[in-house]
């Protein structure tokens, strides 16, 4: 099974807690690691996290730097778990963190394990444009997604891997991502089991 994760609500969470919007991204790190650990225990074979999009790079400089740093830290934290890691995104852009370029080919870390994909500076148009020039998606090493889980209550995919998620079930968690609890994952999985 492959699940996609859209960890939304970091900025709204920060505002609710009287913090700067930028501070919210750091609070999304621990939930990402906890969810990965649960997914591995549950037997999930592949998981894809949505870090940030090409469009997110149009935000104020402080926010861009904050989510870039959070994504670099998230990849390093997640990689401690024993994963087959792939970071996908437009590496030709200045918005793509230099530190993550070494992971743009799938890399077994700590013996490998669950296939972990992390979308960084990802754009669906950028992904699909490669079909015309090279005959395949930039994200061709990412398999079809069975379920997308989005935190933060929004009911949209925001350009999340449109080819791989075309038949995915879409589960929305109302909580903001930094408020993640273990029960969120199990609730989503129970919901998925009831789908056709």
Give the ranges of each region predicted by the language model.
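Flexible, compositionally biased loop and terminal segments
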Residues: 1-196
């Amino acid at each position: 099974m492959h699940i996609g994760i859209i960890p939304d609500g970091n900025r709204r969470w920060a505002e609710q807690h009287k913090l700067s919007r930028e501070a919210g991204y750091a609070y999304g790190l621990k939930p990402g690691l906890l969810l990965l650990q649960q997914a591995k225990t549950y037997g999930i074979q592949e998981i894809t996290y949505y870090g940030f999009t090409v469009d997110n790079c149009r935000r104020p400089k402080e926010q861009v730097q904050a989510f870039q740093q959070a994504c670099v830290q998230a990849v390093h934290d997640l990689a401690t778990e024993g994963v087959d890691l792939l970071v996908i995104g437009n590496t030709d852009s200045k918005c793509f963190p230099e530190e993550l370029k070494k992971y743009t080919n799938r890399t077994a870390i700590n013996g490998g394990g669950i296939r972990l994909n992390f979308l960084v500076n990802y754009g669906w148009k950028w992904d699909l444009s490669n079909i015309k020039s090279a005959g395949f998606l930039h994200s061709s090493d990412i398999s079809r997604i069975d379920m997308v889980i989005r935190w933060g209550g929004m009911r949209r995919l925001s350009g999340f891997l449109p080819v791989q998620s075309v038949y995915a079930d879409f589960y929305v968690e109302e909580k903001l991502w930094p408020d993640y609890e273990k029960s969120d994952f199990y609730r989503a999985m129970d919901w998925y089991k009831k789908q056709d």
